[in-house]
Amino acid sequence: MTISVRPAKESDAANLISHRRALMAETTFMLYEQGELDKTEEDERARIRRLAARGNSTVLVAEDGQLLVGNLTAVGGEVRRLRHSATLALGVARSHWGRGIGSQLLSAALTWSVGAGLHRLELTVHTSNLQALGLYLRYGFQVEGVRRHSLLVDGRYVDEYLMSRLQDG
């Protein structure tokens, strides 16, 4: 298995939508529930263009051959006081869990973020998602706090950790 990680292109729009919809069906760790993502290919192409045009945002994809198996989105702050930071969201297809794809995406995002001049990266993760929590801790993210009952998943309130990583510069 050779995994490649690269910035998303507009031509990835359909595959990104399919991948994100599959993630929503496979796990409750994603923000959206199954059926909630109603984006068209043009919507996704516009999102990729919009984020690529901003110096503090990006979309990365991980591919196993021609199959899109992971993605990471970094959305940078829009107002001056937040432009030094970005919020990350990462998803890997269940079929490829435990193969280091999350690590590859996060490593690529960290490299990109230094070049983009970002000082702060942040994210949230379900407190029960121990695999993802371990990944983020290994890459220098720290827990800043708990967002209590921040999500309602299958009729139950779920806590999330708010995590961040500060970079020199």
How should these model regions be labeled?
Residues 82, 120-126, 137, 142-158:
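Conserved catalytic-core motifs of GNAT/GCN5-like acyltransferases
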Residues 156-169:
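Terminal substrate-recognition subdomain of acyl/acetyltransferases
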Residues 7, 24, 29, 35-95, ...:
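Acetyl-CoA-dependent GNAT
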Residues 61, 73, 87-91, 100, ...:
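Conserved beta-strand segments that form the floor/walls of ligand-binding pockets within enzyme
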Residues 67, 81, 93-107, 115-116, ...:
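Conserved glycine-rich acetyl-CoA-binding loop
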Residues 15, 87, 131:
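Amphipathic alpha-helical recognition patches that constitute DNA-binding helices
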